[in-house]
């Protein structure tokens, strides 16, 4: 079994971006990070994104509107960022307060600044194999992990467990694309799938993104499978100062001996998500420069 070290691969991507940004003349790429409320995970995620942006040499502009902000007020804020020539990418951190419609918020971001890749236009471009759009960061990170770990999906059965807008649907589309590293045969499983283990045991590459701790067990995989564990779940652990530890959707101790390659949690997909956000921001900057002539 080989561990796919997402932290190491993400650090390589950050170093590549740092060199690319250092060579730019004039204004540096800028990402606006909008966080609404004090959800502990969101606070941590945004700080991490701000820190990584600074490490690369990007400008990270953190915006903290009140938790009571209305949909109309948030739209006005986004419209202002859309019109701001000094902003290349916009991310509104999810989850948002319940009174806000997240899907409408994602759609409000201008497609050319939608570096989180969750708007309608960019999701559509993924379906069309159009490289001018932005791929949502976790699916993009998964594909990058596979590529840099020597896993070519051509001719392989890729089973995705989970059908979310954030991971399941876009990663399935990416695995299907007619391009190098992709061309997989894809099955998507979800809560209504019958005899799930019979399907997951067919997987050459298994992507688990269901949000349930230890859901994928040893009897659900075949020997030699490549496992990408997207889940980040908190489980009680009295030995930890925080009172919990992070585990994935895969029962790592049981499944890892059967896998040819597997991502850990933490340190697998998570670091890649931030790295790909930064990569998308630099791409947005370059596309805008190109359009400006």
Swiss-Prot record:
One GO-annotated biological process of the protein: methionine biosynthetic process
A Pfam cross-reference name: THF_DHG_CYH_C
Species whose genome carries this gene: Opitutus terrae (strain DSM 11246 / JCM 15787 / PB90-1)
Keyword tags: Amino-acid biosynthesis, Histidine biosynthesis, Hydrolase, Methionine biosynthesis, Multifunctional enzyme, NADP, One-carbon metabolism, Oxidoreductase, Purine biosynthesis
Record text on subunit structure and interactions: Homodimer.
Family: Belongs to the tetrahydrofolate dehydrogenase/cyclohydrolase family.
Domain of life: Bacteria
EC number: 1.5.1.5, 3.5.4.9
Keyword NADP: yes
Pathway entry: One-carbon metabolism; tetrahydrofolate interconversion
UniProt KW Plastid keyword: no
Any one GO molecular function term: methylenetetrahydrofolate dehydrogenase (NADP+) activity
A GO CC term assigned to this protein in UniProt: cytosol
Protein name: Bifunctional protein FolD
UniProt: NADP(+) binding residues: 162-164, 191, 232
């Amino acid at each position: 079994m080989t561990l796919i070290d997402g932290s190491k691969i993400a650090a390589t991507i950050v170093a590549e971006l740092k060199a690319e940004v250092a060579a730019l003349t004039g204004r540096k790429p800028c990402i606006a990070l909008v966080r609404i409320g004090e959800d502990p995970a969101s606070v941590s995620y945004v700080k991490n994104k701000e820190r990584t942006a600074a490490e690369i040499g990007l400008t990270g502009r953190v915006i903290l509107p009140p938790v009571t902000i209305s949909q109309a007020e948030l739209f006005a804020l986004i419209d202002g960022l859309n019109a701001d020539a000094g902003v290349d990418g916009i991310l509104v951190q999810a989850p948002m307060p319940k009174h806000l419609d997240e899907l409408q918020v994602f759609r409000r971001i201008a497609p050319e600044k939608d570096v989180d890749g969750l708007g309608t236009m960019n999701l559509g471009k993924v379906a069309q194999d159009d490289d001018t759009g932005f791929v949502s960061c976790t699916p993009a990170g998964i594909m990058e992990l596979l590529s840099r770990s020597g896993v070519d999906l051509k001719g392989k059965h890729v089973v995705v467990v989970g059908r979310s807008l954030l991971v399941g649907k876009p990663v399935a589309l990416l695995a299907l694309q007619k391009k190098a590293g992709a061309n997989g045969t894809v099955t998507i499983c979800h809560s209504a799938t019958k005899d799930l283990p019979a399907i997951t045991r067919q997987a050459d590459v298994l992507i688990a993104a269901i949000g349930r701790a230890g859901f994928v067990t040893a009897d659900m995989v075949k020997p030699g499978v490549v496992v990408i564990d997207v889940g980040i779940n908190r489980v009680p652990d009295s030995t930890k100062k925080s009172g919990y530890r992070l585990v994935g959707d895969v029962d790592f101790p049981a499944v890892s001996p059967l896998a040819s390659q597997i991502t850990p949690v933490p340190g697998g997909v998570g670091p890649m998500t931030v790295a790909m956000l930064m990569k998308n921001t630099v791409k947005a900057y370059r596309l805008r420069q190109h359009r400006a002539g």
